[in-house]
Amino acid sequence: MQGNAIIEYPVDQTTLTQRYTEKSIELIKQNKEQPFFLMISHHLPHIPIYVSKPFQNKYEDPYANAICEIDDSVGQIINALKSLELDENTIVVFTSDNGPNQTFEPTGGTAYPLKGSKFFASEGGQKVPAIFWCPNKIKKGSISGLGSTLDFFNTFISLTGSKDINITAQDSHDLSPVLYHGSNSPRSDFFYFSSFIPPRGEIYAVRKGDWKAHFFTSHEPHFSSPDSIEKHPSPLLYNLKEDPGETYNLAEKYPNILQSLIEYSENFSTKLEIAPDRYSKKILSQERPEWAQ
């Protein structure tokens, strides 16, 4: 689709990545004389995995082929910025929305040595790469501080110098000092929720600094059913600095730390405003465009 127009049906998924890339470069060229914002949400490596012919036999693993084509796409876009002399005045961010999907092993990828995958509150489902690139403005290096895609909102407002925008998100932190000066991350905590499996609005896990407590876990990939969810009367406690794979439950050894995380979460819960269930009959019955019927 392009806007509300169906441009191809059924779609040839083997050409999607290259077409997204070509369209992105076209938009960059059209807006090279003015500030622009371009968000590219590639389908790959989400299932089903289809790659274009040049990448179909790069590796034995289809997932690896998909990643290889994504890498090529990023390279084409970076080269376009360089050829247009926009690279030193453009901020490029590369990241992902979640960890691999282990329901579809082996084509879903792996988060090893982290535990879990997509839809899990464990690190394998949540920890993803985040690369910021802008020559002469962002210095080369790596940072291990805590950050979230939630922080992109306030960070982008700061990076673009948009002083006329007086809107900020309460759950977003400005990471620009981290990027420009190597400062410590202003984010020290993160709360984990499930968007569609009950209990909605409950905190599934919380991280504060190096410590993380799990109030709910699932013994099945995808939190596939309410029956797969286990509520822990005594939450699980992990030190992510020493144990990033969340293997050793330290709840009995550090009861005071666990209690502080419980109280921290309870206090946060009192400030929550739960949004309507996006799958409720009320939401689904709202008028939608013809193509979405």
Model regions: which residues?
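Beta-strand elements within well-structured catalytic alpha/beta cores of enzymes
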Residues: 35-41, 67, 74, 81, ...
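Active-site His/acidic residue clusters
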Residues: 4-6, 22-66, 101, 108, ...
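C-terminal cap/loop subdomain of S1 sulfatases and analogous C-terminal strand-loop tails that border
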Residues: 100-112, 116-121, 138, 142-145, ...
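Short glycine/proline- and acidic residue-enriched helix-loop micro-motifs
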Residues: 1-11
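Loop/turn elements at helix/coil->beta-strand transitions in domains of secreted/extracellular proteins
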Residues: 31-38, 86-92, 127, 185-188, ...
